[in-house]
Swiss-Prot record:
Organism: Crocosphaera subtropica (strain ATCC 51142 / BH68) (Cyanothece sp. (strain ATCC 51142))
Transmembrane portions of the chain: none
Subcellular location per the Swiss-Prot or TrEMBL entry: Cytoplasm
Lineage, top ranks: Bacteria, Bacillati, Cyanobacteriota, Cyanophyceae, Oscillatoriophycideae
Domain I: annotated span: 1-70
GO molecular-function term, one example from the UniProt record: four-way junction DNA binding
Full protein name: Holliday junction branch migration complex subunit RuvA
Residue ranges, annotated region (Domain II): 71-149
Signal peptide: none
Amino acid sequence: MISYLKGSPIEVIKNTNNRVILVLEVNEIGYELQIPSKLGREISQEKLDTIQIFTHVQIKEDQQILYGFSTTAERELFRQLISVSGIGAQSAIALIDTLGLEELVQAIVTGNIRILSQPSGIGRKTAERIALELRTKLSQWRKMVGVTVTSSAAMPSLEILEDIEMTLLALGYTNEEINKAISTLSQDNLMLKNTNTEEWIKEAIAWLSQGT
């Protein structure tokens, strides 16, 4: 089993299936790894001489595929995702790529189906299955690897969350910005007791406006 590869990034390309491929030279051998597009952009921008990529090997009848990730936590999350029935490697990478590590874990732990349904190819039923099968596992795992997630007990109801997200997304805010706003507001015990969705949205916009 290959745990990681350390070497020189030769090129980052998109293949005919629109998948991001990193060619990594290790001891004069070029390895092809499929990686999240975000990692591909980082490698292209940083132009480092040597990088370390954590790997997952998938062996099929006719080929061996290497998947690469920037951290062991990201790789482990990928492995957890592909353990879910109906979730293949491409869907797992799409989830990690679209949502990022912390946001994806938070969406699973809190059962936020709307967020989990955002990546292309992930329908509502699939998102529900991911949350159902991984919620307990990831609640324990994220503590061991140090992934920070706002506790579901210290957040507004799922109905309020979805209304906030729908409204703020329509206003042009990103998922990352929205989650930060909700996380910050959820630290206020008075806000947590507030069931008025409009006030949550108003406070979230006010908080987000401070950073603009």
